[in-house]
Structures are given as structure tokens and as C-alpha cells.
From Swiss-Prot:
The lineage of its organism: Bacteria, Pseudomonadati, Pseudomonadota, Gammaproteobacteria, Pasteurellales. Pathway: Amino-acid biosynthesis; L-arginine biosynthesis [regulation]. The gene is argR. It is found in: Cytoplasm. One of its GO terms (cellular component) is cytoplasm. The keyword Transport does not apply. Keywords: Amino-acid biosynthesis, Arginine biosynthesis, Cytoplasm, DNA-binding, Repressor, Transcription, Transcription regulation. This is Arginine repressor. One of its GO terms (molecular function) is DNA binding.
Length: 153
């Protein structure tokens, strides 16, 4: 197994433990496993690459965790259950989610792209801002996003 593959496997195994609340804790754990050249910026890139998000574990601690499913999430997954509210103003749409779910849902919305009227998204822990393309009225995109999650907001 290549060194990069071993690093990826070790990284995923550590995140599955759901006990690392900071990137420096992950760096230390990987160094203890023999990856001496690991640093915070590499860990940050790996967190992004694997779509990891900070969420609460069973002890209610904020920890890094891998998404339940890798790849592009679909609307057949229980993501729609994570959407709490959808609202808009004249220029953008705001989606409120359960804590820790915004980045995963934003990934789904970003994968839809400009053809569906989405110029881009910005996601925090539990809030997503959606900017429509120039040619898509915000009300139309609001309706499309609402229908996507089969909710009655």
C-alpha cells in the first residue's frame, strides 16, 4: 500500500473514532501513528477532500466526522429530514439545517449547479446561503429548493 493510501486510511480511521475536536489533535494522532511529516495545513486539505464536518458526537462534544455517505448525496437520502427552514429575500435564499448538516446539504446544492439556477452556496454549521444565477429569479429558485426537500415551508 502506498504511503498516501496508508495516510488516508489512518486519517479516516481516526475520524471514525469521533473524538478529535481540533486539527492539531488530528496532527498529533497521525504523528503518533508514524506520519512524521504531517502538519495542520495537510490535515485541513484532507478534511476538505473527504468532506469532513464538525458535529456533535454522542457525548455532545464538537468533533470532526466523515459524512455518512461519500460521493454526491442524493435527495433519496435522509437529507431532507435535516432541513429545518427555508427563507429568502430579494437576493438570496437561506436554508437552516440541523447542527452539522449544512455543509453536506450545500454539497448537494452545489452539485446541481448553474443549470438549476444556483450560482453558489456558502455553508456554516447549520446555515446555508444560496445565491441564484443572474437569470433565475430568487422566488423560482426558492420554489425549486423547497421542492427538492419535499417540505412545506
Amino acid at each position: 500500500m502506498e504511503k498516501l493510501d496508508k495516510l488516508s486510511e489512518a486519517f479516516k480511521a481516526l475520524l471514525k473514532q469521533e473524538k478529535f475536536g481540533s486539527q492539531s489533535e488530528i496532527v498529533t494522532a497521525l504523528q503518533e501513528l508514524g506520519f512524521e511529516n504531517i502538519n495542520q495545513s495537510k490535515v485541513s486539505r484532507m478534511l476538505s477532500k473527504f468532506g469532513a464536518v464538525r458535529t456533535r458526537n454522542t457525548k455532545m462534544e464538537m468533533v470532526y466526522q466523515l459524512p455518512a455517505e461519500l460521493g454526491v448525496p442524493t435527495t433519496s437520502s435522509p437529507l431532507k429530514n435535516l432541513v429545518v427552514d427555508i427563507d429568502h429575500n430579494d437576493v438570496l435564499i437561506v436554508v437552516k439545517t440541523s447542527p452539522g448538516a449544512a455543509q453536506l446539504i450545500a454539497r448537494l446544492l452545489d452539485s446541481m449547479g448553474k443549470s438549476e439556477g444556483i450560482l453558489g452556496t456558502i455553508a456554516g454549521d447549520d446555515t446555508i446561503f444560496i445565491t441564484p444565477t443572474k437569470v433565475t429569479p430568487v422566488e423560482v429558485l426558492m420554489q425549486n429548493v423547497t421542492e427538492l426537500f419535499e417540505s412545506s415551508f
